[in-house]
UniProtKB/Swiss-Prot annotation:
Keyword ATP-binding found: yes
Binding site for ATP: G9, T10, T11, A12, S13, G14, K15, T16
Function: Catalyzes the transfer of a dimethylallyl group onto the adenine at position 37 in tRNAs that read codons beginning with uridine, leading to the formation of N6-(dimethylallyl)adenosine (i(6)A).
Protein name as annotated: tRNA dimethylallyltransferase
Family annotation (Gene3D superfamilies): 1.10.20.140, P-loop containing nucleotide triphosphate hydrolases
Site positions (Interaction with substrate tRNA): T100
Organism this protein belongs to: Campylobacter lari (strain RM2100 / D67 / ATCC BAA-1060)
Recorded name of the encoding gene: miaA
Enzyme class: transferase
GO molecular function, one term: tRNA dimethylallyltransferase activity
Coiled coil: none
């Protein structure tokens, strides 16, 4: 029986671990909502599911591209279609899970025409103030470099107000209705998980992975400026020591978790405490099977 649901949460919330456990039990397919896991060479920094599990489960949205290739919403839409077709053909559940909830929102809201990012050297601050002046409806945060450059790209290419252009060019949503569950943690407990995960990543070889990436690819690539890798670049360049490296990754991961929590408020969803989430989701799935 095919049906789909989404399992979202902040970084280090345990959503992937939970999705994997459910997929094993119910023979479900999984679509990853993660903008880093799409890259074959980024494993530790993306906290990617181990290869054995990827081989055993029907996984989509992982190991699609090389680091120097560009991933965008249109490619993610194609991966979703592939995952859904596979799950329907095999009478499976499709679990959509990950931390890049922007992709999930796009699936549910529809995709606008694929405009190129601006190549302008304007700073985030400069783009943000331009946006506030001519397009206050855009509502993009000052630290969201990708969306600000995308906004500026639309403005440069059309010479029109970007939020209006996006409304005019929007395509139909791929998902009309979806049950969404968010894994919740108390802030102090999530903080401990972030600290533990950071230490584990460093012990597993994060610095070595970063060195390999920076030795072989342009450090300006968007994927290489993600949390965990950009701090390692400063460490490898001897700008910071090991203690500072760990501290910065923890701080930046905590800040990311806060942004994710804020973004996830946009969804109509059910919040689940991690400790009881597995049993609650299991009951939800069994109820769906019973009709």
């Amino acid at each position: 029986m095919f049906f789909e649901f989404a399992l979202i949460g902040t970084t280090a919330s345990g959503k992937t671990e939970l999705a994997n456990k459910l997929a094993y039990e119910f023979n479900a397919s999984i679509l990853s909502l993660d903008s880093l896991c799409v890259y074959k060479q980024i494993n530790i920094a993306s906290a990617k599911t181990e290869q054995k599990t990827l081989d055993e489960l029907d996984y989509f949205g992982i190991n699609l591209l090389n680091v120097n290739e560009h991933f965008n919403i249109a490619l993610f839409f194609e991966e979703y279609k592939k995952a859904k077709t596979f799950a329907q053909k095999n009478n499976q559940i499709l679990i959509i899970t990950g931390g890049t909830s922007f992709y999930l929102k796009a699936l549910m809201d529809g995709l606008s025409e694929n405009f190129k990012e601006s190549q302008s050297t304007l700073s985030n601050d400069e783009i943000y103030h331009l946006m506030i002046k001519i397009d206050p409806q855009a509502k993009i945060e000052k630290n969201d470099t990708y969306r600000l450059k995308k906004w500026l790209g639309i403005y440069e290419q059309t010479n029109k107000i970007p939020s209006e252009v996006l409304k005019e060019t929007k395509q139909e949503a791929l998902i009309k209705k979806l049950d969404i569950f968010e894994i919740s943690w108390q802030k102090d407990l999530l903080e401990k998980r972030i600290i533990k995960r950071t230490k584990n990543m460093l012990n597993e070889g994060l610095i070595e992975e970063a060195k390999m990436l920076f030795d072989n690819y342009d450090h300006h690539l968007k994927a290489l400026n993600s949390i965990g890798l950009k701090e390692c670049k400063d460490f490898l360049d001897k700008k910071i020591n090991l203690n500072k490296l760990e501290e910065l990754i923890i701080i930046h991961t905590r800040q990311l978790a806060k942004r994710q929590r804020t973004f996830n408020k946009k969804f109509n969803k059910e919040n689940l405490d991690f400790q009881s989430a597995y049993e609650n989701l299991k009951a939800y799935i069994l109820k769906k099977y019973q009709g």
